[in-house]
UniProtKB/Swiss-Prot annotation:
Catalysed conversion reaction: agmatine + H2O = N-carbamoylputrescine + NH4(+)
Broadest EC class assigned to this enzyme: hydrolase
Catalytic residues as annotated in Swiss-Prot or TrEMBL: 361
Family matches, as InterPro entries: Agmatine_deiminase, Peptidyl-Arg-deiminase_porph
Domain of life: Bacteria
A Pfam entry, by short name: PAD_porph
SUPFAM superfamilies, per database record: Pentein
Gene3D superfamilies assigned to the protein according to its UniProt record, in alphabetical order: L-arginine/glycine Amidinotransferase, Chain A
EC number: 3.5.3.12
Protein name: Putative agmatine deiminase
Organism: Selenomonas ruminantium
Keyword line: Hydrolase
One annotated GO biological process: putrescine biosynthetic process
Length: 371
């Protein structure tokens, strides 16, 4: 059921942190030939491992259209099936974080979704593909599949990757994304902040200036920043002053060092290095896309927004991207230190970042509740 006459905050709901217990995770089977090399064939084996790891510790809801379900079932046939659920919900691409529902809970056993508008990261202004109607309709269907009610955020455009919360009243976003002309150009920064507070049940928004260099989402926060726990955060970093990421991360650090969260705490900040070598599209990869008219294209040599911060926290685990870079091991070390209670699971991510995001972008958590 769609709730149009109230907001989560008015009803006592809030968005819990990703590090809180999950009931499950949404994923979408990757097949879009303009996003994934060889129509998904290169990235699908990574999805198998991702599904293996997540479904071992929580329910896994996999969106896959009827045409591709036999393919998905065949590739997943060797995995235990009791926690894998197939949902016949069509989408235009596979970014469950951005097109799926954002979940809120009330601490009294109720869980609801939020239905934001989705316009493929910028609509007519700078969106990545022109036909995104199935993506925009998916959140309502995803909530319906789980029997969850859904708040209607009206015409407000937002992607799940553009927000991070601590579950204790603090929201972190980037100005580069939320103030971009392709999202909500008729709303002021103050109006956008008011919407975030009302719908996420929060008390304070911290605006970081920038995200990761060359991030085609207009620099989503989930690629540059993440919460470890309330009052403790990770920031993507480089010490190389000649790298274009240096100034972006420096600007974010200055904000975080001077900020306090909704409960007045100063942040403990951990710097998480970006890959030592820029991760770029190869000529072979560029040739293995099939683009539709009006779709954003990949070019050989194009630098990708590779970041270890785009990890995903499922129950008891950290799913960590690996790029075949010398910083891979350092990222494992830092994440292991930050999350001693979790198992760090490194998975190969080059085939994922070629699509434009990483494990956090692909997933959308469903918070656990006491029924």
């Amino acid at each position: 059921m769609m709730i149009k006459d109230s907001t989560p905050k008015a009803d006592g709901f809030y968005m819990p942190a990703e590090f809180s217990p999950h009931a499950g995770t949404f994923l979408i089977w990757p097949v879009r030939p303009g996003s994934w090399t060889n129509a998904g064939a290169d990235v699908q084996p990574v999805f198998v491992e991702l599904i293996r790891e997540i479904s071992a510790v929580e329910e896994l809801y996999l969106l896959v259209d009827e045409a591709h379900r036999p393919q998905a079932e065949n590739m997943l046939k060797d995995l235990p099936q009791q926690h894998i659920h197939y949902l016949a919900i069509p989408t235009d691409d596979a970014w469950a974080r951005d097109m799926g529902p954002t979940y809120v809970i009330d601490g009294q056993g109720r869980r609801r979704g939020i239905n934001w508008r989705f316009n493929a990261w910028g609509g007519d202004f700078d969106g990545l593909y022109p036909d995104y109607g199935q993506d925009d309709a998916a959140a309502e269907k995803m909530c319906a599949a789980l029997g969850d009610e859904l708040y209607d955020a009206g015409d407000f455009v937002l992607e799940g990757g553009s927000i991070h919360v601590d579950g204790e009243g603090t929201v972190v976003v980037t100005e580069a994304c939320l103030l971009s002309q392709g999202r909500n150009p008729d709303l002021s920064k103050e109006q956008i902040e008011a919407m975030l507070l009302k719908y996420l049940g929060a008390e304070k928004v911290i605006w970081l200036p920038r995200g990761i260099h060359n991030d085609e989402t207009n620099e989503h926060v989930d690629n540059v920043f993440a919460f470890v726990r309330p009052g403790e955060v990770l920031l993507a970093w480089t010490d190389d002053k000649d790298d274009p990421q240096y100034e972006l991360s420096q600007a974010d650090l200055e904000v975080l060092e001077s900020a306090t969260d909704a409960r007045g705490r100063k942040f403990v900040i951990h710097k998480l290095p970006i890959p030592q070598e820029p991760v770029c599209i190869t000529a072979e990869e560029a040739d293995s896309f099939t683009f539709e008219e009006g779709e954003d294209r990949r070019e050989p040599g194009e630098r990708l927004a590779a970041s270890y911060v785009n990890f995903y926290l499922c129950n008891g685990k950290v799913i960590l991207p690996q790029f075949g870079d010398e910083m891979d091991i350092e990222a494992q070390r830092i994440l292991g230190k930050c999350f001693p209670e979790r198992k760090v699971v490194p998975l190969p991510a080059k085939a994922v970042i070629v699509g434009g995001g990483n494990f956090h972008c692909l997933t959308q958590q469903i918070p656990a509740i006491e029924r």
